[in-house]
């Protein structure tokens, strides 16, 4: 069974969409299920009337990238590069709301956004 607790959430309010990483206890590290969920969220945002997509983390970290332990456990390839490309190609303007530390692949994800801004934690 797939653990859906802590999957990234999507909220669309008016013309602003927000994807929020929900794993502050592990520095918002992303696993394969998270990547799939974010891809679905990006498809939803691209099909919506949103003009802005904000990506943010919860807690004191923005994102620490992909959970490489999932690769060691025999899981399929991460797909992280495809996620970064999807963010770069996203129709709305993308903003990384950096609420704290950005590590590993989280740096690539932030750089894939059109803008990066520091926000209070």
Task: State where each predicted segment sits.
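Histidine-centered beta-alpha loop that forms part of the nucleotide-sugar donor binding/catalytic region
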Residues: 22, 66, 99
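Conserved CoA-thioester-binding segment of acyl-CoA-metabolizing enzymes
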Residues: 1-58
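Hydrophobic/aromatic residues within transmembrane alpha-helices
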Residues: 19, 55, 67, 109-111
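Glycine-rich beta-to-alpha active-site loop
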Residues: 87-121
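Phosphate-coordinating loops and pocket residues in cytosolic domains that bind phosphorylated ligands
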Residues: 29-32, 73, 112
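Glycine- (often His-adjacent) and acidic-residue-rich active-site loop
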Residues: 36, 57-89, 102
